[in-house]
Amino acid sequence: MKMAVKPLDEVKDASKILAAIKYKSFAKAFFAVKKWTDPKPLGFDLELMPLTDLSNVHVGDMVHFDVSFMGKPFSCTQDTIQYMTATSNTFGGPDNFSLYSYLINGKAQFRMPSAGQWVVNVYVRQDVNPDGKLKELVGKCTTVWYAGTISFNVKP
C-alpha cells in the first residue's frame, strides 16, 4: 500500500500538513424503461435532479436541472460563483470543451450541442472551522468537497 486514508488527528506532526480533504461524491444515471417518470430526490447532501425527460433528449434541446445542497436550493452568492458543468467526448474533440451554467435559485440549464453520452457535475467546497456546520470535523480535516454527477444520453 502506497497511501492510507487517515484523519489529521491520527497523523504524526500534522502541523506540517497544509490541507486535509474529505471527499463526498454522489452520482446518478437516468434512463427510462418504457416511459419516463419524474425521479424523486434521494436525500443526498448534494442533490442534482433533472427537470427534463432525460430519456428523450435530442441535439438542440434544453435540459434543466434542480440543484440542492443540504436540502436547500444551491445558488451563486456575492462571495461565490457556483456553476454546473456538462462534458461529453463528442463535444470539443481533442480540446475537451465543457459547457458551464451558473446556478441561480438552485437551477441550471444547457442547450445540448451534440449527440452522445453527457455528464453534468457540480462541486461544492466547505471549509471546516470550529464555528461552522462541519465543526465535528475540526482536527480531522480542513475542507470537505462534495461532488454531484448525472449522466445521460443525447440523441441525434
Regions found by a protein language model. Give the residues of each.
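Short, aromatic- and glycine-rich surface loops/edge beta-strands on solvent-exposed regions
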Residues: M1, G116-Q126
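Beta-strand-rich domain onsets/edges
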Residues: K2-H64, S68-T80, P130-G132, E136-N153
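Short tyrosine-centred short linear motifs in exposed loops/low-complexity segments
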Residues: H58-G60, M112-V120
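Extended hydrophobic-aromatic, low-complexity segments
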Residues: S75-T77, P94-N96, R111, V120-N121
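Short beta-strand/loop motifs in extracellular/secreted proteins, especially
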Residues: T80-Q82, W118
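Short amphipathic beta-strand segments in non-cytosolic proteins
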Residues: Q82-L99
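Glycine-centered loop-to-beta-strand initiation motif
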Residues: F97-G116
